[in-house]
Amino acid sequence: MNPMDRQTEGQEPQHQDRQPGIESKMNPLPLSEDEDYRGSGKLKGKVAIITGGDSGIGRAAAIAFAKEGADISILYLDEHSDAEETRKRIEKENVRCLLIPGDVGDENHCEQAVQQTVDHFGKLDILVNNAAEQHPQDSILNISTEQLEKTFRTNIFSMFHMTKKALPHLQEGCAIINTTSITAYEGDTALIDYSSTKGAIVSFTRSMAKSLADKGIRVNAVAPGPIWTPLIPATFPEEKVKQHGLDTPMGRPGQPVEHAGAYVLLASDESSYMTGQTIHVNGGRFIST
């Protein structure tokens, strides 16, 4: 189905009482794959880690990477059914997939996940730091210290940990891709802590790009706008879910599959002269960087 035909009048009101959300319970299901897309070997022989790769944007990137020939480790928290579905779709492309459940906010888990990947596949070429959580609050006064620390641990500490553990295995020509957000640039009154982590990711991306440029390792980011992923019904009330994405110039939420090409570009040699940059996929909102 063409993403442009989807959800121009919003979504069915819905809410999930857990984070992370479960993709298989969403209505309609997000579009994670372009069945007409044919890979051309851009990532053939490469090995990628994708955090939060079980669903949403991470799943879409994983499927596209698989179509381009990459073997993939999927890191996820505990959404086992979504992760198994992603694994099946990856393995349909005749590449290998390793599922690694656990909390990327935990440094020890990050170290173990990288080592498992290298032990299983023999190397590592691409790191996609994509996992995130958000907890809307009407005021900063309602953001507890526990929530603040948890959001930062998942969203930005995990990127430090994963990058540190991955770096000894990355060589010239390898790539790191970080998922930031439009909220890093526009802010969001209900997502003050989340937006702060996403702003930190932009600075982290730029700083790491400078740090690793002489080693030939590229570091870039993707900044999604309002996208139809499990995080939306898992965080917002039903009425806000219904209206999600309708205020964009394109008049609809984006689909995960509409981000896949950006991740493939940044993972492949086609972005050999790009580092420290952010690709904005947001339905037409103009961003001052």
From Swiss-Prot:
**What would be an example GO MF term here?**
oxidoreductase activity, acting on CH-OH group of donors
- Give the keywords, sorted: Oxidoreductase
EC identifiers of the protein: 1.-.-.-
Q: Where does NADP(+) bind?
A: 49-73
UniProt-annotated catalytic positions: Y194 (proton acceptor)
Q: Where is the composition biased (Basic and acidic residues)?
A: 1-20
InterPro entries with a match to the protein in the record: NAD(P)-bd_dom_sf, Sc_DH/Rdtase_CS, SDR_fam
Segments of this protein annotated with the region Disordered: 1-39
Give me the residues that bind substrate, please.
Answer: S181
Signal sequence interval, chain numbering: none
Family, as annotated: Belongs to the short-chain dehydrogenases/reductases (SDR) family.
Q: What protein name is recorded for this chain?
A: Uncharacterized oxidoreductase YhdF
Organism this protein belongs to: Bacillus subtilis (strain 168)
